[in-house]
């Protein structure tokens, strides 16, 4: 408990995201009484905090009662026409075709009527309080169906025989395999890698030379580290409705891919460029 007041004494002015606020305040008060925090140091911390708030004009906002804008004002700003237009422009200009197998794109129901859709996500690792219940992969699946594709969602077969599906059976059933990865990093999960399903990584992309295969990342732009041999790969950087609409326009050939990758999507691996 000495570490709490010691942190303030060492120059930390404020604690954020405490586990138990009342407990930490108790430690702070005890530290002040014990002399760990001097009156001068306490005054300095309070002055800095108040100065920061004043520089942001929070005292004026409090006096005017404008901390939270009226609903009418908020509705005139959130999702206003200008913001929607900017979002559409950003989506159209950012989606990146990292690499492609000649002849695979564009995707049309006439060319690939039967699509095996393989969603990858980490929602089972625990939902974030900042995300809604809509799955980005589900949004993409519905968009494919709306375009006229017959979409089958991949389900790993039960038992050991699941890893032994004949290649002939796959080629007879599907014209295209489309992977969609919605694997977002979080504050407590800064590295995200693909975890393949049982039995024995049954959803690993092993048909890339047999069935046209497209891999779409809706979040993390570094998935080629795990799927280097996928020959058509797209980074979207997000999976909201605006991005999915722009993606479908590009997949079907209604709009070109113009995005330039802001990072090295090949992760420094030569084999990912093949």
Predicted regions mapped to residue ranges:
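Preference for extracellular/luminal or secreted protein segments
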Residues: 1-274
């Amino acid at each position: 408990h000495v570490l709490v007041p010691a942190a303030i004494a060492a120059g930390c002015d404020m604690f954020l995201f405490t586990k138990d606020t009342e407990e930490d305040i108790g430690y702070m008060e005890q530290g002040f009484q014990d002399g760990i925090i001097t009156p001068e140091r306490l005054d300095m911390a309070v002055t800095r905090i108040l100065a920061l708030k004043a520089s942001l004009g929070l005292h004026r906002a409090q006096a005017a009662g404008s901390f939270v804008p009226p609903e009418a004002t908020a509705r005139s700003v959130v999702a206003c026409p200008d913001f929607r237009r900017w979002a559409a422009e950003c989506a159209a200009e950012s989606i990146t075709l990292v690499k492609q197998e000649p002849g695979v794109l564009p995707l049309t129901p006439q060319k690939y009527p039967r699509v095996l859709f393989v969603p990858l996500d980490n929602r089972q690792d625990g939902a974030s309080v900042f995300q809604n219940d809509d799955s980005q992969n589900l949004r993409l699946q519905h968009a494919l169906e709306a375009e006229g594709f017959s979409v089958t969602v991949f389900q790993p077969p039960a038992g050991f025989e699941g890893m032994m599906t004949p290649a002939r059976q796959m080629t007879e059933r599907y014209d295209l395999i489309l992977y969609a990865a919605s694997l977002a990093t979080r504050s407590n999960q800064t590295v995200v890698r693909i975890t393949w399903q049982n039995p024995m990584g049954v959803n690993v992309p092993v048909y890339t030379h047999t069935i046209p295969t497209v891999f779409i990342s809706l979040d993390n732009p570094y998935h080629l580290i795990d799927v280097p041999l996928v020959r058509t790969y797209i980074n979207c950087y997000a999976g909201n409705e605006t991005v999915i609409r722009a993606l479908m326009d590009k997949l079907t050939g209604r709009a070109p891919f113009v995005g330039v990758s802001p990072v090295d999507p090949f992760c420094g691996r030569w084999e990912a460029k093949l």
